[in-house]
């Protein structure tokens, strides 16, 4: 079974249709009823079966019960807040930490305007956007790993 069904461009009937402007909607396999009635339910049921199977085979364990008289030394936020928590924890001036928090979304809003002259959609042909994306990804991972470590090892990640 082929994943992509390519049109036969050597067929004179197909070339005549394409010359009239009849595009991809006039050849190939129709979405109704083939995809919507047969393929989508199989994918949905397979996804549900995988989720239920993983939940049954490896259930999530509950953590220790809360003890109000024994608080941990350092309370960490949820994992997705680790990078911003690390910024607030490392920056000495808290106002500067809040300002850095506002610079992140402002910087993300500027990215489309930086490279608006580039007509390519291929990420490898958009060097500015790729550089900003890779720098942001590496910085976020670095800050996230550092937030999980104690404060004295958080900047060097315990390597130095």
UniProtKB/Swiss-Prot annotation:
Keywords: Electron transport, Membrane, Photosynthesis, Thylakoid, Transmembrane, Transmembrane helix, Transport. It is a multi-pass membrane protein. Gene3D superfamilies: plastocyanin oxidoreductase, Single helix bin. Pfam families: Cytochrom_B_C. GO terms for molecular function: electron transporter, transferring electrons within cytochrome b6/f complex of photosystem II activity; electron transporter, transferring electrons within the cyclic electron transport pathway of photosynthesis activity; ubiquinol-cytochrome-c reductase activity. One of its GO terms (cellular component) is plasma membrane-derived thylakoid membrane. One of its GO terms (biological process) is photosynthetic electron transport chain. It is found in: Cellular thylakoid membrane. Component of the cytochrome b6-f complex, which mediates electron transfer between photosystem II (PSII) and photosystem I (PSI), cyclic electron flow around PSI, and state transitions. The 4 large subunits of the cytochrome b6-f complex are cytochrome b6, subunit IV (17 kDa polypeptide, PetD), cytochrome f and the Rieske protein, while the 4 small subunits are PetG, PetL, PetM and PetN. The complex functions as a dimer. PANTHER family: CYTOCHROME B, CYTOCHROME B_B6 C-TERMINAL REGION PROFILE DOMAIN-CONTAINING PROTEIN. This is Cytochrome b6-f complex subunit 4. The gene is petD.
